[in-house]
Amino acid sequence: FFIEVKSCSNKHLTCPEIPKVNINGPCACDEGWDEHGGKCYYFSTNKSSWTESRDECRAKGGDLVKIDNWCEQIFLRTRLNGKMENFEDMFWIGLTDAVEEGRWLWLDGSPLNTSLSFWADHEPDNWTHENPDGEHCVRLGEEEGEEPLKTCLTDGSTKH
């Protein structure tokens, strides 16, 4: 798996989102959501832009996922592996450099913990061929021909 930067307007699968969690008792997620580490995740296979994906997450009471630790990253890698039919299937995550080029922030404003990032070899590259402003959104997926258990994060915002 890797992280890749892409144009925010490109169509990709909606990212996992973090919604309702019962803090005072055992975690009980709504039907269709997966629980891990006290958080609930919804995996949508709708292909949409980063903004459309975020809107879908927020309508369900969550947001695009913020990866806080290695355990969460491994959980996401494992769950997403079962959702992807081919290497182009990637999921938007809540990481962007839209506020300041090259400074990667989660949607809550916290900076990317670089010890948790696994950029693809060529990323972030701020590719400007499709959009002169470059790329500002991040997607999580698997590189073509890579081992299924290998993980890396990529900044992505292209359409498919």
Q: What does each of the following model-derived ranges do?
A:
Residues 1-160:
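Extracellular, disulfide-bonded carbohydrate-recognition/adhesion ectodomains
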